[in-house]
């Protein structure tokens, strides 16, 4: 078989060499490095490796997003001879392919003409040891499934560890989204796939250091608006309630609430802007399926981490919760109760230690 591997790069000098030398397969393969405008040593490093490894091609773009780089690679697959690619992968430039594991995916793909996707497990680097990502724990054995049979696939909104039939090169990433550009394309591919082969082995390891997309006010606002946009779009694509619950759980719990925790730990003072954004998100949840516990977890994040409440901001928060059927007391009672809840929480945490 013929495999095309797309790697979008931009200022990845710390990891790109490790990734490129980790890629090896008995199959005929080519690597397309699509650079979005690196200003560090990424491009010279790729050019040096081109002289050492015969499989690498480099395409340079200017001021291009990750989504644009990936779409350029997909366009290349579509425009070349159909016999040049039977399948493709997209690998994050901060990842590596674990030794001998790429051919686990290619072997599964060749095994059955109905296989349109092969999905392996992803790993993260824990003090020098590769550990299975919790979202991939449902892949317990090698088996053939569909999205309807295995809705847990919707918790894996990453290209890493996935091999696609070349026919899916017609799909596109959303270039208007900076962080969740791949959600819709992955869902479409899973929905269109005749069969999906799961491989219960760790295939790709992620060396990425989480830089957080929500470190300042502007980034946080932009990120939350993006999450709301993609959440609504994908929820409208999913037909089955179980699928919508699993996807919304991933977005609400991991993308939104984890980002909210990080942001509020950095900026604990409660502001009108923060409460308004959380309000907008909570209200958007009401128009689709969601796990109720996630709603309460979001509320706890705001109330436990938030500081410097004033009467006006609290009233906006209180009215928001009343709209979704959750009562809150008057301002003074809230402050007293919150102090007691925080004290009880700290005491419980100390006892656990």
UniProtKB/Swiss-Prot annotation:
What is its EC class? transferase
Top-rank lineage group of the source organism: Bacteria
Query: In the record, what terms sit under GO molecular function?
Result: glycosyltransferase activity
Task: From the UniProt record, list the coiled-coil ranges.
Answer: none
For the keyword Transferase, the answer is yes
- E.C. number(s) listed in UniProt: 2.4.-.-
Q: Name one GO biological process term.
A: cell wall organization
User: Which InterPro entries does the annotation name?
Assistant: Glyco_trans_2-like (IPR001173), Glycosyltransf_2 (IPR050834), Nucleotide-diphossugar_trans (IPR029044)
- Keyword annotations for this protein? Cell shape, Cell wall biogenesis/degradation, Glycosyltransferase, Teichoic acid biosynthesis, Transferase
Instruction: Give the family this protein belongs to, as stated in its UniProt record.
Output: Belongs to the glycosyltransferase 2 family.
Q: PANTHER family given for it?
A: GLYCOSYLTRANSFERASE (PTHR43685), GLYCOSYLTRANSFERASE TAGX-RELATED (PTHR43685:SF11)
Designated name of the protein? Putative glycosyltransferase TagX
Give the encoding gene's name: tagX
């Amino acid at each position: 078989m013929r495999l095309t591997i797309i790697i979008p790069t931009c200022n990845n000098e710390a990891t790109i060499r490790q990734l490129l030398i980790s890629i090896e397969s008995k199959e005929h393969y080519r690597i397309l490095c699509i650079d979005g405008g690196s200003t560090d040593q990424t491009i010279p490093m790729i050019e040096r490796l081109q002289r050492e490894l015969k499989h690498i091609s480099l395409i340079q773009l200017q001021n291009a997003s990750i989504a644009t780089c990936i779409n350029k690679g997909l366009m290349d697959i579509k425009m070349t001879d159909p016999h040049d690619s039977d399948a493709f992968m997209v690998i994050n430039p901060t990842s590596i392919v674990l030794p001998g594991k790429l051919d686990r995916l290619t072997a599964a793909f060749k095994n059955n003409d109905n296989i349109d996707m092969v999905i392996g497990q992803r790993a993260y680097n824990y003090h020098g040891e590769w550990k299975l990502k919790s979202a991939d724990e449902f892949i317990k054995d090698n088996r053939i499934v569909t999205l309807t049979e295995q809705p847990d696939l919707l918790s894996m909104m990453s290209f890493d560890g996935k091999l696609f039939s070349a026919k899916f090169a017609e799909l596109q990433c959303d270039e208007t989204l900076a962080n969740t550009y791949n959600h819709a394309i992955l869902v479409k591919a899973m929905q269109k796939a005749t069969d999906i082969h799961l491989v219960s082995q760790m295939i790709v390891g992620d060396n990425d250091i989480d830089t957080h997309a929500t470190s300042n006010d502007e980034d946080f606002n932009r990120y939350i608006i993006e999450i709301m946009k993609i959440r609504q779009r994908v929820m409208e694509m999913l037909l089955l309630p179980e699928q919508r619950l699993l996807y919304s759980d991933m977005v609400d719990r991991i993308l939104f609430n984890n980002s909210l925790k990080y942001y509020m730990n950095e900026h604990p003072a409660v502001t009108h802007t923060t409460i308004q954004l959380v309000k907008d998100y909570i209200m958007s949840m009401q128009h689709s399926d969601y796990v109720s516990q996630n709603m309460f977890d979001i509320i706890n994040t705001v109330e436990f981490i938030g500081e410097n409440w004033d009467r006006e901001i609290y009233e906006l928060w209180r009215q928001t919760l009343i709209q979704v059927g959750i009562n809150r007391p008057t301002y003074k009672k809230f402050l007293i109760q919150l102090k007691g809840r925080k004290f009880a929480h700290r005491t419980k945490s100390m006892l656990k230690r």
